[in-house]
């Protein structure tokens, strides 16, 4: 399963390339863990504003909504200027932009791509609200609070 650092590396690998890109088409392969939530054609014409990460979710902010991507157990994202037109047997989401194509490869299909109206969308809130603080955000995560939290607890970190 991709852990948080791998998800962050994935985000960094394509975030600057896709920011500002316009969505030309969206193609779905076999169903993933959750449905997209809207017609793929509704994303055509949208512009990618930025790519963020919250926990293990990649959040692709569009000028009209947001895509939430979870890589599941075996998923990976690839952004390239030239990919085969047809989806392979383990490729389940393809977003072609004017700068390249973002493709989800997930052999076990535990991943998900969900289209929402943004951070305040009920689906987004349900998935993101319980995630806790961001360990890679120095503004919110401080050594002192971590140490104090450990000192107050008698629960083993990993039994």
Where are the predicted features?
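Extended, highly charged segments
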Residues: 1-63, 96, 144, 148
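Phosphate/anion-contacting hairpin/loop surfaces
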Residues: 67-159
């Amino acid at each position: 399963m991709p852990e948080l650092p791998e998800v962050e590396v994935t985000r960094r690998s394509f975030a600057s390339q896709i920011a500002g890109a316009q969505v030309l088409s969206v193609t779905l392969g076999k169903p993933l863990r959750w449905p997209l939530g809207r017609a793929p054609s509704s994303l055509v014409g949208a512009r990618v504003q930025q790519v963020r990460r919250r926990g293990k979710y990649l959040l692709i902010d569009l000028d009209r909504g947001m895509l939430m991507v979870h890589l599941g157990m075996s998923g990976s994202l690839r952004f390239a200027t030239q990919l085969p037109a047809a989806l392979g047997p383990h490729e389940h989401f393809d977003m072609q932009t004017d700068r390249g194509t973002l493709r989800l490869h997930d052999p076990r299909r535990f991943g998900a791509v969900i289209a929402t109206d943004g951070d305040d969308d009920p689906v987004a809130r349900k998935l993101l609200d319980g995630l806790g603080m961001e360990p890679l955000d120095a503004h919110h995560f401080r050594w002192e609070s971590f140490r104090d939290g450990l000192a107050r607890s008698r629960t083993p970190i990993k039994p």
